[in-house]
Amino acid sequence: MTSALASRLLQDGLDMHRRGAVTDAAARYSQILKFEPKNVDALCLLGLAYGELKRSAEAVEFLRKATRLAPKHAVAHNFLGGALKELGRADEALASFDRAISHRPDLMDAYVNRADLLMALNRPAEAVETYDRALSIHPNFFQGWCNRGVALERMNRLEDAIASYDRAIALRADLTAAHANRGNALAALGRHEAAVDSFDRALATKPDFAEIHLNRGNSLARLRRREEALASYERALAIRPDMAEAQFGRGMVLREQTRFEEAVRCFDRAIALNRNDAVRGLFHSHRAEALNMLGRFPEALADVSHCLQVAPDDDQALYAVSLVELLHGRWREAWPRYERRIALKVGIPEGFSPPAWPPWRGESLKDELLVLRGEQGLGDHILFSCFGAHLAKLGYRIVLWTKPSLQPLLRTVPGVERVVSDIAVLAGSSDVRWASMMSVPGILGTTPETVPRNRPFLTAEPDRVAAWRERLGTHGFKIGIAWQNAGASHLDKLRSIPLREFATLGAIPGVRLISLQKGAGVEDIPAAAFQVETLGDNFDEGGGAFLDSAAVMMNLDLVVTPCNAIAHLAGALGRPTFVALMHVPEWRWLLDRDDSPWYPATRLFRQSGAGDWPGVFARIADAVHARRSQTD
């Protein structure tokens, strides 16, 4: 074969290759090699073609021959690395890419292939370094900037990843992957509004990308834009009906909307579609919560058992399981799993860092301080400060670490040495241990039968009590009431009571209803068809949270409230309290009992079915009549 003919056949093969006719191109290269078996260009191109045809072992054979004939042929080494990568021979592939780079330091493709392989090997730091070298050669390579962003995201360098995606987008405004990945990084930073914008830009270029609709739905759900989130999940499912994650996301939003039956059906579909045990365990755990809310307790507990079998170490799944177990009174089993909330940062403020002190695990202490960190809502700070009083009684030197607004109130917890809102004031203390307040019952092995009985454990200020006694007077049967929770979660919505339900109490002769409500809900008072006394604009406005509420409660005959901080405050003060509970309450109130292990003076009134506040208040009215007859 003449060199001219070989060149023409090679060019024919290249033209076919570029058009996508890879099999025909391979035939041309093979034809050349029959007559010129040492034609390095034909060997390289045949190896490349075989690689594209998934004939990787043959590709390696021809590319090795090329590199033996031309040891410094950088392109041949690069192609060989690609074929070896496809065969799973990663170390040999990296060595081939390195040889290509050593022979041609400006061969950008070799850097990119090397970096992509490092990403597949989960070595993102080395991948970033390699992408940087590629981009120093070709700074306008938009895909390189995008891939570099993925590597940075893998390293949790999210801001740097976003900057890299921005470079890619500046070079190629319609690069779908850059917009989508940018959205993922923003979502990981909690910047969900910006994430939705990035997902929208990605979908403008590729509207049928199911995963982007899924991630958009997740961010919208975090923003509580629930109807939009549902629409995104449904769009994802229209494109990919087998997408378990979209069914799961849809179920989570429906649960937030208190549409529990629909949520369970979504979780059912998600479980059926997913074969990954850990993920299925997570789905089972959330289905258990939804079943719980429907009162389908045997099914919920069956889901708990299944979850523990298939996902024995998944933080989200085990935390969800713990909430079901706690509600059912299985506290010993639940407490270790409840600790998973810490890894998930449940109720932990943004930017919180654990103290440097050693954690307390239940050991006896001599002169060391034991700092108990309050967590989650105001009611939980109040409730779990009872363990501060309990441990102080056992001889521990207790410091309560709480919200600034609660400091004055919690200073009345008996036996505690200090109440702080900033642990910097303890900087000079060397002998310190610490624990989260809501971890203490688990450390102590607390069960519903062994809750500390040191009630009351809060005290109202005597002067304030006297001032409110004079203001309120002594006439009538005084009932302090609260009705609406301030939060926006599905539980807050279910816990809140329409003010109109208190009409049955207001109709009882001699009863005075006195509002303990602050913030959301007070706007309902003027429209009430019965009298509700208010305590003025300055009520609980200065000097610390609940100081006036506590003093007023000491002058009341009864407090009636849903599950909220008012319920915990009244219980901690030892005041007679009726707590009106939704059909399936938070775990703190347990099931199937009308008393509380936390508060001996508290009675629980439960809905007989979802939304049955009239039934609850009929029973509360009967109890008020009975209570009045005892005191008359």
Annotated model-derived regions:
Residues M1-D632:
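Alpha-helical solenoid repeat scaffolds of the TPR/TPR-like class and their adjacent stem/linker regions
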